Amino acid sequence: MRLPRHIGPIHFVGIGGIGMSGIAEVLCNLGYTVQGSDASESANVNRLREKGIQIHVGHQADNIKGADVLVVSTAIKRDNPELLAARAQRIPVVRRAEMLAELMRLKSCVAIAGTHGKTTTTSMVAALLDAGDLDPTVINGGIINAYGTNARLGGGDWMVVEADESDGTFLKLPADVAIVTNVDPEHLDHFKTFDAVQDAFRNFVENVPFYGFAVMCIDHPVVQTLVGKIEDRRIITYGENPQADARLLDLAASGGGSTFKVAFRDRKAGTAHEIADLKLPMPGRHNALNATAAIAVAHELGLSDDTIRKALAAFGGVRRRFTKTGEWNGVTIIDDYGHHPVEIAAVLKAARQSTAGKVIAVVQPHRFSRLQSLFEEFCTCFNDADAVIVADVYPAGEAPIEGIDRDHFVLGLRAHGHRDVVALQDSASLAGVVAGLAHSGDYVVCLGAGNITQWAYALPGELKALG
């Protein structure tokens, strides 16, 4: 039995969240009655309202009047008044991933998982399948520039979704094709141990049906170990590793992007195939690896080499993934969502490859718990930055932790050998600090999952105002 058409209204608590908004948009486009609430106004809330979805700002029991089902994310606390009212009225409550799983049952599905790179890889898979006239439905964890949204309803048989592992609910997703980009220590507040994280990813791959396949990056040691433990599912490996089934070769930086080729070797058939002259308008080895995963899926689904080349060259990227927000006196300002040490290191390396000038990192640590659990890694991931400007920790609802703050992070970076680290007093001071450090040809890279994106977009204008 699939999600009945008469179900509704479907009420989303926290409808403006990036994961929730995409599901709500697709359900609305399918003809379901959707409503919701959110703590504040946002671009996502406004976009959904334009589609005719009724959205309340603020959470209160009356908002759920008439709802047949409540959809909640893990960000919603157990004492939320709408959640309490739904349970008192015996209205079914489902997690975000459960509703996403219901949508996935309507199509054949590609689900992209991994500690980093999910959103970009999801966008790349969508772009390639779109170019191949497969017209996929897409639900992503970031705004796809080509769509201007994080979701679209396609008319084809395929759906492409980002599988968020943060609370373990990605194991509910019925994927026919699974991608695993990498597995690093993250979301330990939920999983408690890194072993539990690895077990979850193994289960994610083993959930793929026998007629499907998984695409896994064996450049990553943990993923390679997982590949060795999975016996009864078809695996296509990728990476620069010479043992990869889809091998990234001849990677070179070019005009702010990358050029490379991908060589395929079919272990069963003993055949080889190469797609050369690939151009990606994004810098960095990490993005080329993400593209290789997407190419592996597209190749397996029968897309032609020429279609893959054209789609990749035209890829418009994802908002908050190495996004240029402006320039000032020859200085380029970049906004990036990177908030884990592995992501930060990859982004700064891409910036280093993109300019002959200095790389100046502006970092807003995201969550006290993440900074605490990965403190050593944070103190060693800024090696490609000539200078690091450190803002206060963005709490994301967490209470402060003693000894885990901006100033201790600054001391940690210096103790680990970084030569130029500046403590930022507040966002209003950023333009003045940058103006004192940056010269023509330099890159200023704003990093974090909090409100630093607003600083990145305001910074070019604030610098110009300084003269």
Swiss-Prot record:
Tell me a Gene Ontology molecular-function term this record carries: UDP-N-acetylmuramate-L-alanine ligase activity
Q: Where in the cell is it found?
A: Cytoplasm
Q: Which Gene3D superfamilies match?
A: Mur ligase, C-terminal domain, Mur-like, catalytic domain, NAD(P)-binding Rossmann-like Domain
Q: What class of enzyme is it?
A: ligase
Which terms does the UniProt entry file under GO BP? cell division; cell wall organization; peptidoglycan biosynthetic process; regulation of cell shape
Pfam families, per this entry?
Answer: Mur_ligase, Mur_ligase_C, Mur_ligase_M
Catalytic reaction equation(s): UDP-N-acetyl-alpha-D-muramate + L-alanine + ATP = UDP-N-acetyl-alpha-D-muramoyl-L-alanine + ADP + phosphate + H(+)
The answer, when asked if Nucleotide-binding is one of the entry's keywords, is yes
Q: Which UniProt keywords apply?
A: ATP-binding, Cell cycle, Cell division, Cell shape, Cell wall biogenesis/degradation, Cytoplasm, Ligase, Nucleotide-binding, Peptidoglycan synthesis
EC code: 6.3.2.8
Q: Does the keyword Zinc apply?
A: no
Function per UniProt = Cell wall formation.
The name this protein goes by in its record: UDP-N-acetylmuramate--L-alanine ligase
